[in-house]
Amino acid sequence: MWAEGSIKVGDSIFHYCVKHYEEPIEDYGIDGGRISKLMLKRNGEIAYNYDRGLDIKPVDKDTETALAILMKEYN
């Protein structure tokens, strides 16, 4: 299932789009979890991207924090 939304971390507002499943997907989920795809954008630029594998690492601490929040909710 897909989920979209926005999250504020510090002075940054991230738009996210995440594809997640009810059960973990060991082969291509983040850390073997339920998220198979996740994109974080800030000011129209990609700050993190995972598409069945890591494509773009978190660009800074705010991005890492946003990722941790979404991992807790969806993974």
Positions of predicted regions on the chain:
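Acidic, low-complexity, intrinsically disordered interaction modules
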Residues: 25-51
